[in-house]
Amino acid sequence: MHTRKAITEAIRKLGVQTGDLLMVHASLKAIGPVEGGAETVVAALRSAVGPTGTVMGYASWDRSPYEETLNGARLDDKARRTWPPFDPATAGTYRGFGLLNQFLVQAPGARRSAHPDASMVAVGPLAETLTEPHELGHALGEGSPVERFVRLGGKALLLGAPLNSVTALHYAEAVADIPNKRWVTYEMPMLGRNGEVAWKTASEYDSNGILDCFAIEGKPDAVETIANAYVKLGRHREGVVGFAQCYLFDAQDIVTFGVTYLEKHFGATPIVPAHEAAQRSCEPSG
């Protein structure tokens, strides 16, 4: 049974320091049994960064109608009338991004951003700075909490989560100067100041496949491809927390690498011809 002290020490051994801004992607199952459960993991993370540090997570929303309204799909009138609006104060989190985020949301002093599908949660001195504003149309790119996380010198921590979980690399996708980016539209029920509900349409870069060759089912997306290439450079930290294999990345460094990688291989004048890259399902040339 893993204790709070042991988890805190393991996180610090990875390279997390007092005062750090930490975006966490966690698999509680991978960590293994913890005395006190997920609340203990949250407490250990907060202990690792100390009172001057901030912990951030990708909460999203368990009732997000993203798939139901994607690219022109439309809910029937009854569903639109009865679908709950997104309220950062009460909305649940999407479990596909890890159960830990629900416990971050419940932590004292937690702040949550207002973008329903890309909602972020943060706890610590930078929580408000990170989470506000967060408007539709700015999910993970410019103007988003992820941009501010990168700009403020954050670190991305994978606690047993796979390499395709590095959300900061979606920011790299958004700002990289490459042609033929995929776009999506969707609708979200937003809560107005007077309690009214309004369905609003958003247009965003497709974080499920920024290019066609990264949107092939069963193949690595851009995030996983870039993260794998970055790990080979050895500029990150690796270790074990509980039973989980973990990675710690400097967000600015991996994002800079990601932007360069995308522009090198898929820019207007890529080193790798676009048709060859597509044939390789976006695998790097070496």
From Swiss-Prot:
UniProt keywords, alphabetically: Acyltransferase, Antibiotic resistance, Plasmid, Transferase
Gene Ontology MF annotations: aminoglycoside 3-N-acetyltransferase activity
Reactions mediated catalytically: a 2-deoxystreptamine antibiotic + acetyl-CoA = an N(3)-acetyl-2-deoxystreptamine antibiotic + CoA + H(+)
Annotated GO biological process: response to antibiotic
The keyword Repeat is annotated on this UniProt entry: no
Leader sequence residues: none
PANTHER family assigned to the protein according to its UniProt record, in alphabetical order: AMINOGLYCOSIDE N3-ACETYLTRANSFERASE, SPBETA PROPHAGE-DERIVED AMINOGLYCOSIDE N(3')-ACETYLTRANSFERASE-LIKE PROTEIN YOKD
Protein family per UniProt: Belongs to the antibiotic N-acetyltransferase family.
Protein's name in the database: Aminoglycoside N(3)-acetyltransferase III
Species name: Salmonella sp
